[in-house]
Structures are given as C-alpha cells and as structure tokens.
Amino acid sequence: MLAIGLLYDDTLLAMAAIWRRSETFAHAWLVPPIVLWLVWRLRGELALLAPRPAPWVLLPMAVAAFGWLLGDLAGINAVAQLAVTALLVLAVPAVLGLAVARRLMFPLGFLFFMVPIGEFTTGVMMEWTADFTVWALVATGVPVYREGLQFIIPSGAWSVVEACSGVRYLIASFMVGTLFAYLNYSSPVRRWVFVGISILVPIVANWVRAYMIVMLGHLSGNKLAVGVDHLVYGWVFFGIVIGIMFVIGARWQEPAAAPRAPAAADAVGTATPAARVWPAAALAAITVALAPAAAWALQHPMDRPPLVLTLPTLPGAPDAAAQVLKLPPHFEGAATQAHRVYAGEGGAVTVHVAYYRHQGYGTKVTSSMNFLIPSDDRHWNRLAAGVARVPVPALGSQPLAMRAHELIGGRTASTVGREHLEVRQVYWAGGRLEHRSTWATAWGLLGRLAGRGDDAAMLTFYTDGQNPEAARRVEAFVGQQLPALVAHLEQVRAAAR
C-alpha cells in the first residue's frame, strides 16, 4: 500500500483536494479514520488468520492499473481515483491472502466512499426537484410559470441551482446509512433494505425541502428563506429527517454476529513464511508501477509550434456585418477559442470553436466544468434541450446527431419581445464527430494511444429566432459548412505534428 501511495500520489492528492474545496465531498475526510477504526474492531479475529498471498490477484491489479492509465490519459478523475482505490483494496488479498480480505470485506469496500463521485446526477436531480416543486406549488393553489429550471410565482422568481439538487444530502446519507446498516444489522436483507432507504429518503426529503423553502418565501412576502438562511433551513430539515430515519432504523437493530473461528487452513498455525510474503509484495509493487511509467512516457511533452486558430472563410457564407459573440459558451482550459459570424439565408449564424490540446484533468473538452450556460445565468434561460439529427450529405447518408438547445433571453413571465437562440453543438475528437461526451472522450483516448495526439474541439452553432425557422436555418448551415470546418480543424492539428 505504501508503494501505491508513492506511485499514485498525484491521484490521491487530487482526491483530497476535491474533499477540501467541495462541500459535497467533505464527508470523505472521515472515511480513512472510519476504515482504520473498523479494522481495529476486528483485530482479535485478524490475529487468528495466517497471511497467505494470492498471486492470481495480481491479474485484477494489473487491470485496475490499466484502468488508472486510461483514466489518467483521458483526464477523468473518477476513473483514475476509482482505479487507485481498487488497487488499495486488491493489495490486501494479493499480499495477505483471501481469508484476511474476506474478513475485511466491508472496511475495504467502505474505502470507495473516498472517491468523490456522484455529481453526474446533479442535472437529473435538479430536474426532479424542479418538477416536484412546481407540482406541489400548483397542487397547493400557487400559480406557476416555468421555463426549464426557472419558475415564477406571484411573489417572485425562483430557480433550481446546483446547491438545490440534493446531491450533497444523497451522498452523505448513502455513506452514513451504509455504515449504520453494517454496524446495526447482521442480516444481509436488512442491511440492503436500510441502504436503499438511505438513498430514497434524502431524494424525497430534498424535494419537500425545496417546496418548503419556496413556500416560506412566498408566505412571508420574501422576507424568509430568500438568502443564505434558506440553506440553513435546508440543512436543519435534512438533519431532522435523517435523525428520524436512524431512530426508526435502530428499532430493528440485531445483535452482532458471534466471531467465526477461522478454517483450519487459514489458522495462524499454518502461517505462510515471510519469505513468501515479501516476494508477493514486491510483485504487487512492480505490477502497480507499470501504469505510472507508461503514463509518463505517453504524456511526456513534445515541442510543438504555437497553436493558432482562426475560422476560415466559407463558400456561400460571407461574413456578417456584425461580428458580436452574443452567446459566449463557457469552456475552461481551452488551448484557444475562436468565433466568426456568417451571413446565412434568412439570418446570421455564429460559429464558436473551443480547441483543446495536451488535455488533462483541468483542461479537457468534455469536462463537467464546460457548459453552454450556467444554471443561474442572468442573460439566458434554457427552454429545451435534446438531440437533433442533422443531414450532412458530405459526411455520409446517416444524419449527424448533435446537441440541440433552445434559449430565451431575460427572465419574465412572458415570451413576447424576448430574444431566442437556436443552438447546435458537436464534439470533434479523435477525428470523429460525436454529441455524447463519453464517446468523445473514448475516441480522443484511442487517438492518443494510436499516436495521433489528443487534439479535440467543441463546435457550437447558433442563430436568432424561434423554432422551426431558426432550427432549419442553423441546421442547413451545418449541413453545408460543417465538412469545411472539420477539414480546417484537421489542418490545424496536422500543422502541429
């Protein structure tokens, strides 16, 4: 484990950095001491077990190390951190044997709560929270006008932002509920039922919390629950709900199972000589060392000319008179960004390109920190989002799947006189066009492993107006001009080789 800590220190430190800066994962600081305490509780049983290395576990360790390599090259924190945690877990049976690992199954599994993962559910939980809040308001006689995650009631405007999603409550409840179930129940059925309850309760509680916050503000004339205090009310409510859940769960507490005597083959009297334990530890260390060595070789920077990106003149699409970037998409860590406004049939179409090179954890095109507009944007609101199938004859007979967004400007209870934008987006990664971030990451990783570099980009197209005219305009532009833009990006990539 010491070797894993030294070889993968960057990944472990990055994990701790997330615990420090993100309140969502602050609970992870408690995981290592809890695991040590759980192991200490079992010290009497562990003392009866003989260490018997299991060399075959080196194979899953190699798979986990390769998973870390892929996650590190792709800049995916969750994959790299899950892989390192798996290495820590697998090191126990590899060096100390399966009997020890079986007895430590829960403490070792609990280590995975160190990994700061789960924020991918934020979007869908925000939608669920908004759906329930609006439904509950209407059910209690409060009229609501809704636009995406924003809604307006007679007393004011409200929005569901990331902090309202309930992900923080869910992850904390899941961790504490899992520990509670292990310590208080011996039946697997009761344990799994309580873990399921610890997932369901915070989701529903967060919906009720959001509704109560809005109603507090509404009934108090926006004097209560409209500032920082509504977060305080939320945590108090959550604490009460979780406390009640544990009190009820304790009513079905079961006595702890009696310690099991080890099998004769696992008993201390049959201990494996230290001369066999140390070679197993050395082989495990060598296995886990291969992935960091490969990562260093693949990521060693090469001298390349500076990146210059200007969007080209396109045939049949002259420049528009006004070159104003009306909607600047948010892309962190891009090597360069460029935009150009083209005059099209019926109106102008703006093209924005965020170009990435030498991608890493904080500088990747598919980062969750990259978005079209933030959820609390004051200038634009998302009316709809989905996938559009856009015919691009030069790229094949199958329509190209693109991300589709309909945006509206301002925040009032009327759509009259408000600006609309019709937006289409697509990734260019590994020489392919892809609308799904996971596949874009995969194509980029394959290109990197094949020695073609990791250049990638997000192409954003938008035009003024409402469906269906604006949608036809922007999609017609994409169908005609996307091949030329892709060819230009290929030239930019080739110029740096």
Where are the predicted features?
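Hydrophobic N-terminal alpha-helices or hydrophobic patches in metabolic proteins across all domains
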Residues: 1-497
